[in-house]
């Protein structure tokens, strides 16, 4: 049986922290779908299409990763892909309460889909897409925080020189 996992998020933009979780998940599962979810509570900086392209570029060296988007419930997407797992990254204890609520709801919707938590490497424990955008907005150096394709895309969006 093929093991299929879903790694979802807004990825606005994808960071090296996200990429770390994806790479580590890809070592455990036969296939990993990286899915951009449309979060109605967030106003996106990059369009869904831009995010998909950035993720494809960032994950092109990982052969068992596929990139997609979805606007419905994650559990429904997982069922559609015959996935048996959801991958979630945890940066700090503060992430756990929110993630536990989401996991409990997903389990209520489908008890056959397990959630696997992966602790972020310490070097990325502070990192979020919001922080990256804020630093880039003011022309700060985001290399070492995001893949190079994202660094270029941020520079283009903000019209700032790379530092």
Curated annotation (Swiss-Prot):
The principal localisation class reads cytoplasm
- Residues that hold substrate according to the record: 10, 42, 74, 88
Q: Which PANTHER family does the UniProt record give?
A: PHOSPHOPANTETHEINE ADENYLYLTRANSFERASE
**The protein's name:** Phosphopantetheine adenylyltransferase
What EC numbers are recorded for this enzyme?
2.7.7.3
Q: Which InterPro entries match?
A: Cyt_trans-like, PPAT, Rossmann-like_a/b/a_fold
A GO MF label: ATP binding
Instruction: Give the protein's cofactors.
Output: Mg(2+)
Residue ranges of the TM segments: none
Keyword rRNA processing (UniProt):
no
Q: In which pathway does it act?
A: Cofactor biosynthesis; coenzyme A biosynthesis; CoA from (R)-pantothenate: step 4/5
Q: Which reaction does it catalyse?
A: (R)-4'-phosphopantetheine + ATP + H(+) = 3'-dephospho-CoA + diphosphate
Q: Which family does it belong to?
A: Belongs to the bacterial CoaD family.
* Sorted UniProt keywords: ATP-binding, Coenzyme A biosynthesis, Cytoplasm, Magnesium, Nucleotide-binding, Nucleotidyltransferase, Transferase
Q: Where in the cell is it found?
A: Cytoplasm
Species whose genome carries this gene: Bacillus cytotoxicus (strain DSM 22905 / CIP 110041 / 391-98 / NVH 391-98)
